[in-house]
A protein has these predicted regions:
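Conserved phosphate- and dinucleotide-binding cores of soluble alpha/beta proteins
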Residues: 2-5, 9-12, 18-24, 30, ...
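HTH-adjacent hinge/linker in prokaryotic transcriptional regulators
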Residues: 2-29, 34-99, 107-115, 119, ...
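Conserved SAM/SAH-binding loop
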Residues: 103
C-alpha cells in the first residue's frame, strides 16, 4: 500500500473509531511502528488528526461519532466488558443504565438475570430489556435525542435524583491522559453526574478507543467511579489516578 493510501485509510479509521492506537495501526497495515509514527506525525501536521502518545484521535472535539458507527466498532471488546459486568450484578438488584453503546451491551448481557429493577435514560436499553417480563423497567423523562436514543435534560436529571440504586452502569465518550472524563453534550454530563451521585456502586464501562479521545465537556475525574471495566491497561496517567484513589480495575 502506498503512503497516501495508508494515510487515507488511517483517517477513515480515526473517523470511525474516534481513537486508534499505534499498535492497532501497526497490526492493521502490517508495517513497522516507526512507519506508523511517521504517518501520524505527517497527518497531525496537516491537522487531519490529533496526535496522542500511543495513538491518534479526531481533531474535532465538538461532535461525536454517529451512533450507528459506534455501535459497529469494538463489538467483541464491548461484549467481553458487558459479560464481566453482568457477572458482578446479583439477581434482584436495582441499577441505572446510562446512554452509550457499551452500556447497551451490558443491558443485553443482563437478559439472563431475573427480577432486576432498572432505571434508564436510554431508549435502546429499554427496548432490549422489555422482553423480560420479570424485569421492572423505569424510563426517565426528558428530551429524546433521536440520533442515539438518549434521554437528556433537566427533567431527566431531576427524575434520576429521586432514586438510590445498587449499581450505576456508566459510559463515557473520552478519557483524557490525566483521568478526566469527557463528553460532547453538557446536558448529558449533568445526567451522568446524577447517576454517579445516586448509585451505591458506579461501574464505568469503556473500551480502549475511549482512552485519549477528545470531547469538549469535562465531567470530572475518573476517581468519581468505583470500578473501571475495560479491555486494555489504561495509559500511565489514568493508572496513577486509579491507583491513588483505590479504584477497582477489571480487564476484560
Amino acid at each position: 500500500m502506498k503512503q497516501t493510501q495508508r494515510h487515507d485509510a488511517i483517517i477513515e479509521l480515526v473517523k470511525k473509531q474516534g481513537y486508534v492506537s499505534t499498535e492497532e495501526l501497526v497490526e492493521h497495515f502490517s508495517v513497522s511502528p516507526q512507519t506508523i509514527r511517521r504517518d501520524l506525525n505527517d497527518l497531525a501536521e496537516q491537522n487531519m488528526i490529533l496526535r496522542h502518545h500511543g495513538g491518534a484521535a479526531l481533531p474535532s472535539s465538538s461532535v461525536n461519532t454517529p451512533w450507528h458507527d459506534r455501535k459497529a466498532t469494538q463489538t467483541e471488546e464491548k461484549e467481553r466488558i458487558a459479560r464481566k459486568v453482568a457477572a458482578q450484578i446479583p439477581n434482584g438488584s436495582t441499577l441505572f443504565i446510562d446512554i452509550g453503546t457499551t452500556p447497551e451491551a451490558v443491558a443485553h448481557a443482563l437478559l439472563g438475570h431475573s427480577n432486576l429493577r432498572i432505571v434508564t435514560n436510554n431508549l435502546n436499553v429499554a427496548n432490549t430489556l422489555m422482553a423480560k417480563e420479570d424485569f421492572r423497567i423505569i424510563l426517565a423523562g426528558g428530551e429524546l435525542r433521536s440520533r442515539d436514543g438518549g434521554i437528556i435534560g433537566e427533567a431527566t436529571q431531576d427524575f434520576i435524583a429521586q432514586f438510590r440504586l445498587d449499581f450505576g452502569i456508566l459510559g463515557i465518550s473520552g478519557i483524557d491522559s490525566d483521568g478526566s472524563l469527557l463528553e460532547f453534550d453538557y446536558h448529558e454530563v449533568r445526567t451522568k453526574r446524577a447517576i454517579i451521585e445516586n448509585s451505591r456502586h458506579v461501574m464505568l464501562v469503556v473500551d480502549h478507543s475511549k482512552f485519549g479521545r477528545n470531547a469538549m465537556v469535562n465531567m470530572g475525574s475518573i476517581s468519581m467511579v468505583d470500578a473501571v471495566y475495560t479491555d486494555t491497561l489504561p495509559p500511565p496517567g489514568v493508572m496513577q489516578v486509579l491507583t491513588e484513589n483505590y479504584i477497582q480495575l477489571e480487564l476484560c
